[in-house]
C-alpha cells in the first residue's frame, strides 16, 4: 500500500496535481473538521464507483490512517488499476 504524508499531499495540491481526495470517516467527524474532498464513510465504501474517465490518484484519509487502510484494501481488490494512497497517520496531527 502506498502512503503519502501530509506535507507531500500539500505539495501536490500546491503544484495543482490532479487528484481525488476521499474522507472515510463518519458524517459527524467530517462535519466537525475535514481537509476537503468527498465524504464516503467506511460503512458505505462498497457504494463508491470511480469515474471511468478519471485516472488521477486517489488519496484516502481518516483520523489516524486505519480506516483509510481498510478502505484502500477493499477498493484495490475491486479497482486494481487505480492508484490509491493512504494519508499517513491520518489527520490526527491537525486535530491536536
Q: Locations of the language-model features?
A:
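Rhodanese-like catalytic fold shared by cysteine-dependent sulfurtransferases
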Residues: 1-20, 24-57, 66-96
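Short, surface-exposed ligand- or partner-binding patches at beta-edge/loop junctions that are enriched
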Residues: 61-62
Amino acid at each position: 500500500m502506498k502512503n503519502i504524508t501530509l506535507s507531500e499531499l500539500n505539495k501536490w495540491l500546491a503544484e495543482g496535481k490532479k487528484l481525488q481526495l476521499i474522507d472515510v470517516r463518519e458524517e459527524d467527524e467530517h462535519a466537525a473538521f475535514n481537509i476537503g474532498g468527498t465524504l464516503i464513510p467506511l460503512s458505505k465504501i462498497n457504494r463508491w464507483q470511480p469515474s471511468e474517465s478519471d485516472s488521477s490518484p486517489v488519496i484516502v484519509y481518516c483520523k489516524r490512517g486505519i480506516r483509510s487502510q481498510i478502505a484502500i484494501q477493499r477498493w484495490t481488490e475491486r479497482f486494481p488499476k487505480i492508484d490509491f494512497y493512504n494519508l499517513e497517520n491520518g489527520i490526527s496531527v491537525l486535530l491536536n
